Amino acid sequence: IGVGHFEPLRHYAEVHLKLEPLPRGKGLVFESNCSNDELALNWQNLILTHLKEKQHKGVLTGSPITDMKITLVAGKAHLKHTEGGDFRQATYRAVRQGLKEAQCVLLEPYYSFELIIENQYVSKALFDLENKHCAFKIEEDMNNLVHIKGNGPVRELMDYQKDVIAYTKGK
């Protein structure tokens, strides 16, 4: 739950948002689960508009957030002091605070790879791939060639093709 509060002199807005992960590729989904008795429908619609109008950035790398459901669960307005821009600030603050509370984890990017090499270089390749923390499987021999498929951390495999070319002499 992220809570955003905006209350400078003669302004007031408070927004409570629930942030939930969605399956990969689902995009961002916004909805309201807030009672009209608690917050007027026009303010709820305004908050949903503010959520949709901006590309929100994550707190770890500043990358755009994806595949998340953001639900308005509560909000507060003041009859005399609330204006539309107040909810914009409170909404953005609620998203940011919710992301900070979410205990986000930065996932390491991985490459998928296929390596087809001669039998004589297999032990060197397997040694390298294990040292680079790769997961792989070895396919059947094909005319003195071995087919290795797997994946591993980008930071370890960035320049690995140069190593393969060097120890196989380009074969």
Question: What does each of the following model-derived ranges do?
Answer:
Residues 1-171:
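Accessory interaction regions appended to the cores of large information-processing enzymes
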